[in-house]
Design a protein with these regions (language model features):
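Feature 926 captures the class I aminoacyl-tRNA synthetase adenylation module centered on the KMSKS loop
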Residues: 1-269
């Protein structure tokens, strides 16, 4: 006999992880100034060992909740520091190292050369420091006659992503999103959102679902959104069963609506 409480627990774990992933994705979107309604081209999701299968069991929900076309789930074992950066890099993720000095620890080692050390550190390629730390757990700066050797613990190593991506992380859950903009995909997403709201308005007004109405009108789109869909009025008309769609004040009564922060007015008659 299958224990149903175990099944429930598994489902609950999957949904908890999905919720957390969507939350981290939202944080990455905010950093990138990408609104929830814009579909993402690609997302790379890093999870703990054993969690890939858990998240993949909700594959379609992952896509719809994150509003992403393609995603890849990567299991990682390291949750911080140089080890995490090296693992992400080794897995082919678009990461770049971010290194700072542990100021309190290096004072006694740098002594009077502190200013020069900081300058030299800022001019040194982070990758070369990491390569050296990997080999011998220390890095030596040659400052004139003096050499200052810093241990691995004297560096704070983290990662960032290259300019084509943005990311957010919470412990070992990392979501990296592509900033590549696909206008066709974005237009489709906006049309779908508008059509859904216009169909709801049709229902509210009591129109028969099979009737072809005269027109639908959409006002107050921002310039970006208008540019995406201005040439796609036939697609919208087909979806909402009207003869034509316009973007001018041509109807009697408009309803105010909101699409993920985009305030619009819609009408149908």
């Amino acid at each position: 006999k299958i224990d149903s409480s175990l099944i429930d627990e598994k489902v609950e774990t999957s949904f908890d992880l999905l919720k957390e992933t969507v939350s981290v994705t939202s944080a990455a979107r905010m950093k990138a100034k990408l609104k929830r309604r814009w579909p993402l081209n690609q997302a790379l999701i890093c999870v703990n060992k054993g969690e890939k299968e858990v998240l993949e069991s909700l594959s379609e929900l992952v896509k719809s909740q994150m509003n992403v076309q393609n995603y890849e789930i990567i299991e990682i074992g390291n949750s911080e520091g140089m080890e995490q950066y090296l693992e992400l890099k080794q897995r082919g993720l678009p990461v770049v190292p971010k290194i700072e000095l542990e100021r309190s620890a290096i004072g006694p080692k740098a002594k009077q050369d502190m200013g020069k050390l900081l300058k030299m550190f800022s001019e040194t390629d982070p990758e070369s420091i990491i390569d050296e730390l990997k080999k011998k757990d220390s890095y030596t700066f040659q400052i004139g006659e003096n050499s200052v050797t810093l241990d691995k613990e004297d560096f704070v190593v983290d990662f960032e992503v290259n300019e084509r991506y943005q990311f957010a992380k919470r412990q070992n859950l990392i979501v990296i999103i592509s900033l590549e903009r696909d206008d066709e995909m974005m237009a489709k997403g906006l049309i779908k959102d508008l059509a859904r709201r216009i169909q709801t308005l049709r229902k509210e007004k009591g129109y028969n679902p099979t009737d072809i109405l005269e027109k639908a009108s959409i006002l107050e789109l921002d310039q970006d959104s208008f540019n995406l869909i201005k040439d796609k009025t036939e697609d919208i008309a087909f979806l909402v069963r009207v003869k034509k769609v316009d973007f001018i004040e041509s109807c009697e009564n408009y309803k105010e609506d909101d699409i993920d922060g985009l305030k619009v007015k819609i009408a149908v008659e």
